[in-house]
Amino acid sequence: MSVDTLSNAMIAIKNAEMVGEKKCEIKPASKLIGNVLKVMKDYGYIKGFEYVENHRGGKFIVELSGNINDCGAIRPRFSSSVTEYEMYEKRYLPARDFGILIVSTTKGVMSQKDARKQRLGGVLLAYVY
């Protein structure tokens, strides 16, 4: 049994993307994973997702679009201020303006681009490109 459900979700998406699958199953489901999937959908990395209750913690069925080259969870979860986002972009993303970092802020889960516009710091959760 795994401890980090977000890492498992990102690995499941990455593996399904690499073998060319159209759908991926993520279990167990959580609100955090749902919010991360919503950000990924907003930026076009996945087509959509659906929550299914199975009386074992639920699961998400994710419809993949084939736009993900790499994705993963960031461990340990670094706290970041607005001025530090660029440092983490250089570390986790391959090029400037290519991909997103997913951040948990006081206003909810969003990309680092939205957090920078709203001048919010937060905790880094994942990267996608």
UniProtKB/Swiss-Prot annotation:
Annotated InterPro entries: Ribosomal_uS8, Ribosomal_uS8_CS, Ribosomal_uS8_sf
RNA-binding is among the record's keywords: yes
GO cellular component: ribonucleoprotein complex; ribosome
Entry GO MF terms: rRNA binding; structural constituent of ribosome
Keywords: Ribonucleoprotein, Ribosomal protein, RNA-binding, rRNA-binding
Single GO biological process annotation from the record: translation
Pfam families: Ribosomal_S8 (PF00410)
Assembly and oligomerization: Part of the 30S ribosomal subunit.
Role summary: One of the primary rRNA binding proteins, it binds directly to 16S rRNA central domain where it helps coordinate assembly of the platform of the 30S subunit.
Family of the protein in this entry: Belongs to the universal ribosomal protein uS8 family.
Protein name: Small ribosomal subunit protein uS8
UniProt source species: Archaeoglobus fulgidus (strain ATCC 49558 / DSM 4304 / JCM 9628 / NBRC 100126 / VC-16)
Gene this protein is translated from: rps8
